[in-house]
A protein has these predicted regions:
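N-terminal single-stranded DNA-binding subdomain of primase/primase-helicase replication proteins
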Residues: 80
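Intrinsic, low-complexity polybasic segments
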Residues: 6-9
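NTP/phosphate- and nucleic-acid-binding module
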Residues: 4, 29-76, 84, 90-639
Length: 639
């Protein structure tokens, strides 16, 4: 879990006339694992690193809030951070609900504020001063946020024109520095992310340095709508949701099940070749295990409520035990390591599992396959000695690169999060030598591998350095795919030890890795990445045979059976449609390859080959085309 960082004012110059500061009241969600989020205040280091674009977007959030306040003076304000996509601000307006029809009016007011070229003025104030100002404005949510700031920390406000906000930036110098923006959408958001709190209106927007960049991004968003995994998933019948099953609980339909099976097959083959051993763990466990791991009580809000069961103990007494659906696989894997004595000869020990986990995501945050409550994670824990660590970490990174090549992921970045030596024993486990050694080794692996990475200080997990893997889809949209973490704290909590060469006990290092993330998020990404046009090896329906007339049906059925027996996913169009209609249907269904069979093809034991999106590929002998298909499938070739 991320810990709350201390914040202080900071002055950061920029060639763009960028302002200074660091947001105090704004909280953001930082992804610490695939599908795992925690809330943390931005630190001083975060503010220093803020990019020019982040500053423009944060400033634009203030301009939007100022415009809303001009139009609806009774609006209550909560938070307004920048995001990867742009920015948002949370409002409570008792007598008005935002709709897209409001956007032109708000945007017009924002343009006026930008034209006024207002200065973003930062002031350091006392707690009493800020409280009085917020009380005078009747801003109840801001008053609660003020209480979050620890005693003794500087409190700053930013003012532009008549608008004042409890904030420490960062901002541009003037509203006129904002050159291109657009409001995007409105959504419901619970105050502080808790469903028991009031529901606010979250107004989203985006901003860019240039109008041309905004136009390009908007075009990309239009393409993203066309590639929306929820839309394509429904059209292709890959997955479904049902109210009786529950929100965030995807039902994988047969074609979606094929995607899962193919991805798991790839993972199992890759992991077997790399020396992993497969394990299987239960879907729930007793409370005590998660207390030992440290997930309880700190992660309790993201776990489903406990199940209480009355059990008869060995001595005949009855006891109520509390069980939790597992939100992560690692504690179970630690128990497998501890199931019998271990020797250095067994290390590295690599335990892998596509484990089912359950996260209690807020209903308002659920989003298709990207944010779910039931998920299957490509998880593994690697237990090793310090001497083995560098080779193991490199092997994990090599596995990522292999997967990226197979799935045609050309743009990616690894974000290497390190610790702050001054916060050892507070935010981070107090093992200075291990921190230095593991961070140096991780850094060395990244450099020698030539991997594109950025180093982010003071963002490591409490138990060790970590790498968050960002990937970009074919249309340039960024996704968080997976994580790779070093753990030299939790194994000790579980008492994990092995016998060394000197016959003494030592605690192993542990590498958590999930290179394919979860089925849900990864397949959601792949649907957009490929626009549903999966490569041959992954396509749910690899081949569809299209006989022109009934005279070709026996030949086509014999061909279908032969291909099916060879392990090819093939179907036969037995409809009475004309061949043009059959081709259109196959294209609409995103069937990868089509075999058109007419009288001439039947006589010559050949097929007229078509490939989805590429059209006619000519007439080819059956033996030749089948050999080609099988070779491409076996090689997991990209199209």
């Amino acid at each position: 879990m991320n810990a709350v960082g201390r914040v202080a004012p900071v002055i950061t110059p920029s060639v763009l006339g960028i302002g200074h500061g660091g947001c105090i009241a704004g909280w953001q969600k930082d992804q610490v694992m695939a599908e795992e989020h925690s809330v943390a205040r931005k630190t001083l280091e975060d503010r220093n690193r803020a990019s020019d674009l982040e500053r423009v977007r944060h400033s634009c959030a203030h301009v939007m809030a100022a415009a809303v306040m001009r139009i609806w003076p009774n609006a209550q304000l909560d938070i307004g951070p920048s995001t990867n996509e742009g920015f948002y601000y949370d409002f409570d307006i008792p007598d008005h609900r935002f709709t897209p029809e409001d956007f032109p009016r708000i945007e017009e007011e924002m343009k006026k504020i930008i034209k006024e070229n207002q200065v973003f003025q930062k002031e350091i104030r006392t707690r009493e001063e800020v409280k009085a100002l917020l009380e005078a404005k009747g801003q109840k949510f801001k008053l609660e946020r003020l209480n979050d700031i620890p005693e003794g920390e500087p409190i700053s406000t930013f003012t532009n024109g008549e608008f004042m906000d409890l904030c420490a930036g960062p901002h541009v110098m003037r509203t006129g520095n904002i050159k291109a923006f657009k409001l995007l959408r409105v959504a419901a958001a619970y105050y502080r992310g808790k469903e028991t709190n009031p529901q606010l209106q979250r107004l989203y927007g985006t901003a860019f340095m240039k109008k041309t960049e905004l136009e390009e991004w908007l075009q990309m968003m239009e393409e993203a709508k066309r590639r929306d995994h929820r839309k394509i998933g429904k059209e292709m019948r890959l997955f479904a949701f049902d109210e009786d099953v529950g929100p965030g609980m995807p039902l994988w339909l047969p074609k979606g099940g094929i995607l899962i099976a193919e991805i798991e097959k790839l993972a199992m083959e890759t992991e077997f070749a790399a020396g992993y051993e497969r394990v299987k763990t239960p879907h729930l466990a007793r409370e005590n295990m998660y207390t030992t791991s440290g997930h309880l009580p700190y992660y309790a809000d993201s776990m489903f409520p406990p199940i209480e069961m009355k059990e008869t103990m060995a001595d005949g007494t009855e006891k109520v035990e509390r069980y939790y659906l597992k939100a992560m696989n690692c504690p179970h894997h630690h128990k497998i390591f501890a199931s019998y004595p271990r020797s250095y000869r067994e290390l590295p020990l690599r335990l892998a599992e596509y484990g089912c986990c359950y996260r209690y995501e807020q209903s308002g945050e659920l989003f298709g396959l990207m944010r779910v409550r039931s998920l299957q994670m490509n998880d593994a824990q690697i237990y090793c000695t310090p001497e083995q660590f560098a080779d193991e970490f490199k092997a994990v990174n090599d596995m990522y690169l292999k997967y990226f090549k197979i799935f045609g992921i050309e743009k990616f970045q690894m974000r290497f999060s390190t610790h702050d030596p001054e916060r050892l024993g507070q935010k981070y486990v107090n093992e200075p030598e291990l921190w230095k050694k593991t961070e140096d080794m991780v850094r060395d692996v990244l450099i020698k591998s030539g991997i594109n990475y950025v180093e982010i200080p003071n963002e490591a997990a409490f138990y060790g350095p970590k790498i968050d893997v960002q990937v970009w889809s074919a249309i340039g949209r960024e996704f968080t795919l997976a994580t790779n973490q070093v753990d030299f704290a939790v194994p000790a909590r579980f008492g994990l030890v092995y016998r060394t060469r000197d016959n003494t006990e030592a605690t192993p290092l542990c590498i958590h890795r999930a290179p394919l993330g979860t089925h849900e998020r990864f397949i959601g990404f792949l649907i957009e990445h490929y626009a549903g046009n999966f490569p041959l090896w992954l396509a749910p329906e690899q081949v569809r045979i299209l006989p022109i007339g009934s005279e070709q049906m026996d030949f086509s059925e014999a061909l279908r059976k032969r291909m099916h027996d060879d392990g090819i996913r093939v179907t036969l169009d037995c409809s009475g449609d004309k061949i043009g209609g059959k081709i259109r249907n196959a294209e609409t269904d995103k069937v990868h390859t089509m075999f058109v069979v007419g009288h001439k093809e039947q006589e010559a034991n050949s097929v007229a080959l078509r490939v989805h999106g590429k059209g006619d590929q000519g007439v080819r002998p059956v033996e030749e085309v089948l050999a080609d298909l099988k070779q491409k499938i076996a090689a997991r070739a990209a199209d």
